[in-house]
């Protein structure tokens, strides 16, 4: 059973953190059974597709791809590892008409994420103020990703940027 935080607890935490506490509010699709039906019975639903950051100061949905691995693959077994990876790679590429991406093949463009499927998990979103004029946005980090390789160069290692910028 998921613990519901009462208003008294929220007010106390808000006071203790001088208003900096963040509270998750799951707005959409709370019924995981219905969501499972949508994800498994339709070949047209790819949760990794987002709004390109249009609402980064209000909502956080960047953890979806990690959630596919941690929840739908590892915890529930809804997808095999191969199916989970397809939901994040070739499936969305096809939907978007990106014919040169989505699979690892000679001549294709590819960023490669190296991860430990037994460790991948999404962390709590955090609010940062790194937009122009100190405007806020939510970011969500993860655990279990070992490296991101772009055009043969490691750009992220163990969650930290390496400074290498090999993208085109």
Model-based region annotation:
Residues 17-21, 54-57, 92-95, 120-123, ...:
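Flexible loop/turn segments at secondary-structure boundaries
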Residues 2-7:
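Short, small-residue-biased leader/transition segments that mark boundaries at the very start
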Residues 41-62, 107:
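Short acidic/histidine-rich active-site segments
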Residues 22-33, 82-85, 93-127:
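Acidic, glycine-enriched loop/beta-strand segments at the rims
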């Amino acid at each position: 059973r998921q613990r519901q935080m009462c208003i008294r607890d929220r007010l106390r935490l808000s006071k203790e953190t001088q208003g900096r506490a963040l509270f998750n509010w799951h707005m959409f699709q709370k019924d995981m059974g219905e969501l499972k039906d949508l994800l498994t019975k339709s070949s047209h639903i790819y949760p990794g597709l987002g709004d390109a950051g249009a609402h980064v100061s209000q909502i956080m949905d960047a953890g979806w791809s990690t959630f596919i691995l941690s929840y739908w693959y590892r915890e529930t077994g809804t997808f095999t590892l191969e199916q989970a990876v397809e939901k994040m790679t070739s499936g969305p590429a096809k939907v978007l008409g990106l014919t040169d991406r989505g699979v690892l093949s000679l001549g294709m463009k590819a960023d490669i994420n190296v991860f430990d499927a037994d460790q991948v998990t999404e962390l709590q979103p955090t609010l940062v103020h790194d937009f122009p004029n100190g405007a806020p946005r939510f970011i969500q980090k993860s655990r279990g990703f070992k490296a991101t390789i772009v055009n043969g160069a490691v750009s992220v290692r163990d969650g930290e940027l390496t400074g290498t910028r090999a993208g085109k």
